[in-house]
Amino acid sequence: MVSRPCGDIYHYDFIVDNGRDLWRVQVKTGSYMMEGLYQLCVRRRTGGVQVPYTKSEVDFVVAYIFPDDTWYVLPVRELAQRETVSFCPKGSSRQDHFGYFREAWHLLQGPDGLVFG
């Protein structure tokens, strides 16, 4: 089940209930490319300052790369306080640091095997 919090006071966009866990999920969309890699900001603004997401605020950042029609399901612990992450385009021969998380909906899987995505 996916729920949306009421108001804009939380650092996440959705709660995903997989029957065992409640995951706080922040959704980001990107299409900006620099030096052959898609660049995506994974930070929030507070008091006029941009800061990275932390484990106390969100559990996953789900990134949609629009030109490739590709989703990445990123555990926030994998972001290691980064404010920006880079993704290789589909078909690229470059090593993609976050390639394991491409379409990794299984990370949100519940005990009944239900997978979101």
Label the predicted regions.
Residues M1-Y10, I15-G117:
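Mixed-charge (Asp/Glu-Lys/Arg
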